[in-house]
């Protein structure tokens, strides 16, 4: 599982649209869709109900979206802490 895939899921959830989320993430819509589908296949769940418009999270997606946000937040905190250590050690 890649951090980027979680960022894609979060973007789709926020924008309720795969095309807009892809634009925000600077990737093609097909790349974003394939990455999310890959994560769904890996875990055997569906994050989004693609039949609804605007796109909505499934119950499984609802149960996991806050955890995805937490992972992304912690990764950003880790990156900042590591950068600060580098600056302080120079």
What are these regions (language model features)?
Residues 10-28:
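Short helix-boundary/capping micro-motifs
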């Amino acid at each position: 599982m890649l951090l980027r895939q979680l960022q894609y899921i979060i973007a789709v959830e926020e924008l309720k649209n795969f095309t807009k989320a892809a634009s925000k993430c600077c990737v093609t819509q097909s790349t974003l869709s394939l990455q999310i589908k890959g994560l769904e296949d890996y875990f055997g769940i569906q994050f989004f109900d693609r039949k609804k418009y605007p796109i909505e999270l499934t119950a499984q997606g609802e149960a996991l979206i806050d955890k995805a946000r937490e992972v992304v937040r912690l990764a950003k905190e880790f990156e900042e802490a590591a950068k600060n250590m580098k600056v302080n050690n120079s």
